[in-house]
């Protein structure tokens, strides 16, 4: 899709700390996003990141780019091993239900599928090969605990993504944990030596002994195997900047000698009661929790899009209810468009102008670092303008179809608009509608009101128009 008045896409690059014009090195665009660690159900804070990444990919496609998208599935790391060992079951048996639940949640939130979902356990040989190369280069070493570590002192550019100055920090002890804070940059683990008490029966054989790969190495190898040595975009949550993405850069560039990714995009935290939503804090909600409260995936997706991805978003039930109301307004608008039946061969000039101006405003918002909240503002301005045109009585079926097509275009990015309002109306309700219409024709207003109340009690609203009654669910 071409936009004559838009210079190009601008993204905020974490590495440079500024907005940059997007100019990919590859066709299709190589996009890698960090996926779930399948030790539990993903919470809606995780899904804020996944929805942001979905908007990123949809925006690229909207602007005419083809994209190859890889999202990893982390099925072996500290937490999955601990979970499987605690239940005394094989690793795959432990992770498989959470993997399946993740894909179900993606569908519920209308998140477009990636092209590849590599599982870490499927790439162990490639990871062993990479560690062997790093050992041969002298960039990695075997510690006293028999684990293999990456030496930060052998990679001078370490810290360039998270903007760390190693000379001013305590460095470089060794750390075998997958996650740690940026005040303590350490030689990180590439291969974690097997510990029977900790790991049970979960290990792989390697030239450097039994064990399993470190979490950071897993993403590097899966990305490079499927997308090549250099990516166009690497995205994730702000939690991933350090140490995960910093370590990915170090080991990947040490292996290839090439820049690992050109653009780094990171989404901010989802808050609950003003605090970061986190499993470690115990203040998290899963998508399933919200579905059990009778919210919909559409409402949750809408809520997760209500602030710019680089701004923290505070979750409240009131905010989710407000999203339900906004979606109802949009649904009523679509229903009104579908109900237009005035004949017309072509859309009005004002309809064409309004649609063109809306698409331009929406596209400018996206091009400005995925400013979806501004895009929504332009959408509701557009809805108000078209409702005014309909009120004037000159809006034809051709106009309504053109507007519906415009909404479909923007929804290829948003993925949240209620673009169909058709529902199955029970025959009993339609019979009541017919009886009410007959009562109105005979001016039996008391009977018409009684039948209207029965229709309402059945969960439907009847609206009278020049072309006859229209029925829609409450």
From Swiss-Prot:
Main location: cytoplasm
GO molecular function: ATP binding; cysteine-tRNA ligase activity; zinc ion binding
Residues that, per the record, bind Zn(2+): 34, 219, 244, 248
Record-linked SUPFAM superfamilies: Anticodon-binding domain of a subclass of class I aminoacyl-tRNA synthetases (SSF47323), Nucleotidylyl transferase (SSF52374)
GO cellular component, one term: cytosol
Pfam family, one: tRNA-synt_1e
Essential cofactor(s): Zn(2+)
CDD domains: CysRS_core
Subcellular location: Cytoplasm
Catalytic activity, reaction form: tRNA(Cys) + L-cysteine + ATP = L-cysteinyl-tRNA(Cys) + AMP + diphosphate
Cofactor note: Binds 1 zinc ion per subunit.
Binding-site residues, ATP: 279
Motif ('HIGH' region): 36-46
Motif ('KMSKS' region): 276-280
Family: Belongs to the class-I aminoacyl-tRNA synthetase family.
Protein name as catalogued: Cysteine--tRNA ligase
Source species of the chain: Chlamydia pneumoniae
Taxon lineage: Bacteria, Pseudomonadati, Chlamydiota, Chlamydiia, Chlamydiales
């Amino acid at each position: 899709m071409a936009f004559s008045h838009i210079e190009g896409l601008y993204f905020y690059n974490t590495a440079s700390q500024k907005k940059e014009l997007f100019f990919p090195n590859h066709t299709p665009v190589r996009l890698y996003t960090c996926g779930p660690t399948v030790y539990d159900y993903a919470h809606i804070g995780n899904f804020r990141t996944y929805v942001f990444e979905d908007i990123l990919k949809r925006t690229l496609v909207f602007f005419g780019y083809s994209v190859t998208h890889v999202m990893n599935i982390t099925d072996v790391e500290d937490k999955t091993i601990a979970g499987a060992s605690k239940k005394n079951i094989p690793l795959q048996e432990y992770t498989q239900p959470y993997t399946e639940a993740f894909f179900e949640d993606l569908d519920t939130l209308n998140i477009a599928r990636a092209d590849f979902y590599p599982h870490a356990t499927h790439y162990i040989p490639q990871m062993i090969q990479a560690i062997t190369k790093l050992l041969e280069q002298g960039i990695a070493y075997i510690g006293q605990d028999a684990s293999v570590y990456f030496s930060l002192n052998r990679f001078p550019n370490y810290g360039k993504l998270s903007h760390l100055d190693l000379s001013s920090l305590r460095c470089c002890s060794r750390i075998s944990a997958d996650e740690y804070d940026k005040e303590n940059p350490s030689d990180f683990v590439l291969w974690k030596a097997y510990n029977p008490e900790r790991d049970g029966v979960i290990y792989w054989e390697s030239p450097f002994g039994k064990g399993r790969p470190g979490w950071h190495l897993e993403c590097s190898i899966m990305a490079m195997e499927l997308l090549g040595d250099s990516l166009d975009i690497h995205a994730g949550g702000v939690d991933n900047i350090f140490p995960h993405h910093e370590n990915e850069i170090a080991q990947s560039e040490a292996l290839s000698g090439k820049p690992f990714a050109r653009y780094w995009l990171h989404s901010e935290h989802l808050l609950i009661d003003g605090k970061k939503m986190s499993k470690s804090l115990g203040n998290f909600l899963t998508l399933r929790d919200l579905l059990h409260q009778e919210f919909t995936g559409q409402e949750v997706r809408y809520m997760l899009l209500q602030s710019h991805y680089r701004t923290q978003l505070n979750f409240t039930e009131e905010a989710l209810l407000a999203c339900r109301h906004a979606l109802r307004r949009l649904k009523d608008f679509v229903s009104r468009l579908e109900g237009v039946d005035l004949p017309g061969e072509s859309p009005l000039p004002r309809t064409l102008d309004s649609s063109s101006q809306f698409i331009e405003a929406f596209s400018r918002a996206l091009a400005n670092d995925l400013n979806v909240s501004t895009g929504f503002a332009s959408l509701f301005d557009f809805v108000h303008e078209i409702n005014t045109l309909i009120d004037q009585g000159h809006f034809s079926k051709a106009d309504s179809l053109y507007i519906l097509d415009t909404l479909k275009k923007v929804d290829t990015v948003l993925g949240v608009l209620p673009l169909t309002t058709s529902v199955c109306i029970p025959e009993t309700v339609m019979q009541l509608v017919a009886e009410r219409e007959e009562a109105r024709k005979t001016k039996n207003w008391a009977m018409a009101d009684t039948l209207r109340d029965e229709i309402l009690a059945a969960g439907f609203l009847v609206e009278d128009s020049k072309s006859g009654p229209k029925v829609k669910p409450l």
